[in-house]
């Protein structure tokens, strides 16, 4: 047993250090998988899986050096973007310099599909801000570094009457602006990019004009259905002299009578023609 322990101790003492040629090359500021999945390693800062300048823990070796990694420079996250690098470090990779794109924007490690635009919005500064409120009314205006501007003024007379504007820079680089008024007539906005109602078809326009003329002339059509000839006597219809039913004494009808009788009475049975059928 003592011999076994002694041999183990001698083996450990005589064990040579693993030569660097059996390990991946040492990382530097421009390559590797560095700062890696969690920022600072368990034995130091700025490296990949291990501590400073080391890999899994061996001094002078490791998978990545300071300032490299999936997320870019120091403090970069796990993603395509980051401060100045993509997959390969500061000098190259899938994205350009300065956090211009990628799923991880800048050193904050936040998700951003818009890349640099989202970073500009998140870091926008207020350039101007004025706000004044009195018993008679109010007025305010502000402007930010990412192109947002707004202003409004209003007075408390017969309710609240106000007017103002709002503008911003879109993702396409164009400026969009809206002006508005709000008073007893409601909220009315104007802007070049706002949708407009389609034109009224010519047939509908003519119908509306005709309805307006009829209403001015006292003709009212409420859309109720009225059958043809309903409530009307006269020459046509089911009534008339010699007809099946009385009427106002017109000329026609179902009956075969001539001039008819006053009041439109039906033809008597004695006056009607008869047909005799003889059985042999």
UniProtKB/Swiss-Prot annotation:
Signal peptide per UniProt: 1-15
Keyword Signal (UniProt): yes
Disordered: annotated segments: 258-280
Superkingdom, taxonomy of origin: Eukaryota
Pfam families named in the record: Chitin_bind_4
GO cellular component terms, A-Z: chitin-based extracellular matrix
Name of protein: Pupal cuticle protein 36a
């Amino acid at each position: 047993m003592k011999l076994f322990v002694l041999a183990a101790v001698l083996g450990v003492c005589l064990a040579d250090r693993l030569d660097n040629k059996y390990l991946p090359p040492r990382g530097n500021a421009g390559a590797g998988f560095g700062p890696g999945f969690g920022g600072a390693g368990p034995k130091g800062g700025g490296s990949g899986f291990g501590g400073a300048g080391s890999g899994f823990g061996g001094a002078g070796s490791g998978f990545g050096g300071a300032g490299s990694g999936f997320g870019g420079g120091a403090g970069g996250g796990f993603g395509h973007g980051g401060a100045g690098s993509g997959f390969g470090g500061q000098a190259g990779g899938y994205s350009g310099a300065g956090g211009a794109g990628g799923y991880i924007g800048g050193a904050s490690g936040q998700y951003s599909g818009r890349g640099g635009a989202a970073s500009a919005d998140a870091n926008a500064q207020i350039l101007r801000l004025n706000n004044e409120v009195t018993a008679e009314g109010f007025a305010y205006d502000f402007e930010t570094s990412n192109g947002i501007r707004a202003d409004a003024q209003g007075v408390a007379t017969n309710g609240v009457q106000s007017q103002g504007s709002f503008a911003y820079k879109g993702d396409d680089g164009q400026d969009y602006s809206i002006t508005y008024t709000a008073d007893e007539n409601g909220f009315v906005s104007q802007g070049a990019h706002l949708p407009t109602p389609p034109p009224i078809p010519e047939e509908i326009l003519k119908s509306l004009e005709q309805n307006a003329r009829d209403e001015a002339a006292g003709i009212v059509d409420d859309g109720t259905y009225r059958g043809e000839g309903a409530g009307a006597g006269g020459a046509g219809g089911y009534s008339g002299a010699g007809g099946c039913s009385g009427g106002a004494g017109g000329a026609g009808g179902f009956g075969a009578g001539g001039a008819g009788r006053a009041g439109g009475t039906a033809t008597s049975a004695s006056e009607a023609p008869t047909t005799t059928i003889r059985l042999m």
